[in-house]
Amino acid sequence: ILASDFAGNQESWGTWNKNPPPKSALKVFPFDWSSEKSWTVLPEFPETIVLTIPPLLNDPPAERIRLNQWCEWMKKNRTNIKRIIYISSTGVYPKRNGLWHEESEFEPDTNSGKLRLITEEILAHFFKLHVVRPGGIYGKGRGIDLRLKYGKHILVSRTPVHRIHVKDLAGIVFHLLKNPDSVSCINAVDFDPKPSWEV
């Protein structure tokens, strides 16, 4: 969705890792966040990166070291990149009763939540950072059928899950790209929660 919005901008580009995206007018190239050799393919001219890659390592201390190494490399070798819009997750919030918002202080109670929060903290240390914390993402290319196809774990629960349509998420990111002085953290959910198997 964002690719079509920015395809006409010569300074816009995208990356892919395992599976090339559908053909688009947007310039794209392969990128492996885990390999320093791959970092050099990142262009030098943009000011903002939209980062959608999830944490790579399951061990929080090791992921912290890896992220710091990447950020240090970026500050030294890609000095024009000043801002990152990071797609995190509402999974950073504890799964217990309580009221949580963007400025709450909390400790995630899942490893994936801890890894996401570590990523947010480290990126904020090196860049001007906008964090978008979406709920479960649904819409074209995001259904349960695809998760089953790729062997992803599906939690079956009757508890409603906060979610957001992929087009609405893209709209939020587009707004942040065009408005660099917007808020630094957004919980991105709609008003139509569903059980986990419908997300």
Model-predicted regions and their roles:
Residues 71-109:
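Conserved Rossmann-fold NAD(P)-dependent oxidoreductase catalytic core, especially the SDR/UDP-sugar
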Residues 25-47:
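Conserved Rossmann-fold cofactor-binding substructure of NAD(P)-dependent oxidoreductases
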Residues 172-175, 179-199:
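Mid/C-terminal beta-alpha module of Rossmann-like enzyme folds, strongest
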Residues 120-140:
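Conserved beta-loop-beta element that borders a ligand/cofactor-binding pocket
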Residues 42-85, 118:
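NAD(P)-cofactor binding segment of oxidoreductase domains
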Residues 1-9:
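N-terminal Rossmann NAD(P)H-binding glycine-rich loop of SDR-like oxidoreductase domains
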